[in-house]
Amino acid sequence: MAVTMEYEKDVKVAALDGKKIAVIGYGSQGHAHAQNLRDTGHDVIIGVRPGKSFDKAKEDGFDTYTVAEAAKLADVIMILAPDEIQQDLYEAEIAPNLEAGNAVGFAHGFNIHFEFIKVPADVDVFMCAPKGPGHLVRRTFEEGFGVPALYAVYQDATGNAKDIAMDWCKGVGSARVGLLETTYKEETEEDLFGEQAVLCGGLTALIEAGFEVLTEAGYAPELAYFEVLHEMKLIVDLIYEGGFKKMRQSISNTAEYGDYVSGPRVITEQVKENMKAVLADIQNGKFANDFVDDYKAGRPKLTAYREQAANLEIEKVGAELRKAMPFVGKNDDDAFKIYN
């Protein structure tokens, strides 16, 4: 189904004017939404549990409260805490403080679509989902443009939910570059599939498999790292800028010919069938329930997966090589933890 890109001129109603806005969570998306909205003249407070994020929000000049206090004070509440903690946070601290006519927003449809969170019928539920990480949402805003966003309405109690969603997207800078209307179902299922089958799960598995094929055939791990991981950014940047066409115009004829001949040998019809199975587990709620169950059990699976990933040879080789390549960027773990 074709969709129409919308821009600032299409945001007809200043639905957030005069509203007290509470951003719940001050992590990757939270700090960006809050700062951008404040810079566009909105009345923003922060609701977050005590800790680094609480301290960072105060340092950045926000009136900062507990989640319950912020929810009680606000007309519009945007929940930007991690997906897995949102249900407990909502039930314990937000739901008891909601009033008829309030609006509750999300940047991802996970908890609403899979019904971990159920909002009263007299409260609006909307979405503003910028298609980029929080630091990029903030940086591009400061540069005078923004990151494209999806917006959606799940529940329109007041008749104003769409206006609130669009005005929120305008406030964070996304309407400068383009908005696409979607649904909670579509955003949630497509986002999870993209992460799992292509952007995160599929990509890292492909890189790891390529590295293992080369090293198992006797090639030097350091050279294998450059061939299958380091150069990935160069190719992805070309695709990002101009699609497959620009990438293929920019590489050698040898590489282009190999692309056409060998790509389908790697990504076969069986791989597509595996992707369909991944999508099915997303659609039927299996993935969501497994993820939440693991969180409630203390994250044993996620912890084990992280330990396994940290011990991969490609990670160890890459860590050593990057020490000699300061141009690839500094890994500031402390800042990353504050904003995640």
Swiss-Prot record:
The keyword Transport does not apply. Residues 5-182 form the KARI N-terminal Rossmann domain. Mg(2+) 2 binds at D191, E227, E231. Its cofactor is Mg(2+). GO terms for molecular function: ketol-acid reductoisomerase activity; magnesium ion binding; NADP binding. Its EC number is 1.1.1.86. Transmembrane segments: none annotated. One of its GO terms (biological process) is isoleucine biosynthetic process. Substrate binds at S252. This is Ketol-acid reductoisomerase (NADP(+)). The lineage of its organism: Bacteria, Bacillati, Bacillota, Bacilli, Lactobacillales. The gene is ilvC.
